[in-house]
Amino acid sequence: MSNYWLNIYKPRGISSAQLVSIVKKILGRTKIGHAGTLDVEAEGILPFAVGEATKLIHLLIDARKTYIFTVKFGMQTNSGDCAGKVIATKYCVPSQEEAYAVCSKFIGNVTQIPPAFSALKVNGVRAYKLAREEKKVELKPRNTTIYDLKCLNFDEKNATATYYTECSKGTYIRTLAEDLALSLQSLGFVIELRRTQVGIFKEENAIRIKSPDEITKNALEEKSIKIEAILDDILVLDATDSQAQQIKYGQKCLFNYEKDFRHLAKFAYREEFKGNTERSTTAYTLVREDASTGLTYKLPLEVEFGKMSIDLVWVRYKGTLLAIGSLNKSCFNSLRVFNLTQDFF
């Protein structure tokens, strides 16, 4: 197997780029990417894509993520973590009750200003490079979503609190920590940060690597995860020989979804966030039961005067991933085509 995922745990103290170099050296491969950079001072899940799996990285970047982080109250650093310089102090430590109660204020849609020490670009230059040169960095506010936030532990003696959060892409935990502290009439920065989950990738079965000598290529590949694993909750279409040929050559092709889908239904659902900020959305969902696995898939739909579209589906040919794309009525439009097999026609 040459196209797969690896569930890697990045240790604290090395950059995501350094870990990529280590994995490349072990595997002897150059087509390797990762989903979601972690700061040097952070640790945790960093999914790696090998070979054709790199074409699916954008799906993982969009996936929900979970973190556990510890905030030190009373000080603020220029980087938002312990690697930066202290730029302000305000020794005001919240009570345990306040540290727990503040969480509800942040659940839902929130607006963040990214930290100056970030990989975002300002006029073509990475923000952290400008910040290191002590140049003024102005970044635009960004919208993000906090699905869950709770305090796990409060230590009054050391003026720290540990939190768990589940959030959307683009969420800066350092900014969240600073905003939490400000809401508690204090200052704060992150002293520990661990990413515990990215989509289907969890820390309990992650591979821990610090150097190329710690694991062999064979041992690493034995822990590989099939390329289709992150597509398990996305609608799959099985292509015929003629459909596969059309997709392979970049052509649009038709699928008879009413015939292919064993179970089709539309229903409205509402998603609510509790707290000061509430969001409710209504959409339609396609339900399909896969007879071979017994699993039921739920996909968002746009239904208007008989028009059906699905933003993301994947196509399988002879049991192997062929393409991902969108379905507009019966027409499949490919976004990525994969070269996983030579078994064509």
From Swiss-Prot:
Matching Gene3D superfamilies: Pseudouridine synthase
Top-rank EC class of the record's enzyme: isomerase
Biological processes per GO annotation: mRNA pseudouridine synthesis; tRNA pseudouridine synthesis
UniProt KW keywords: Isomerase, tRNA processing
SUPFAM superfamilies to which the protein is assigned, alphabetical: Pseudouridine synthase
Organism superkingdom: Bacteria
Keyword Iron applies: no
One function term, GO molecular function aspect: tRNA pseudouridine(55) synthase activity
The keyword Cytoplasm is assigned to this record: no
Functional description taken from the UniProt entry: Responsible for synthesis of pseudouridine from uracil-55 in the psi GC loop of transfer RNAs.
Entry-linked NCBIfam families: RPE1 (TIGR01045), TruB (TIGR00431)
Identification of the protein by name: tRNA pseudouridine synthase B
Gene (name only): truB
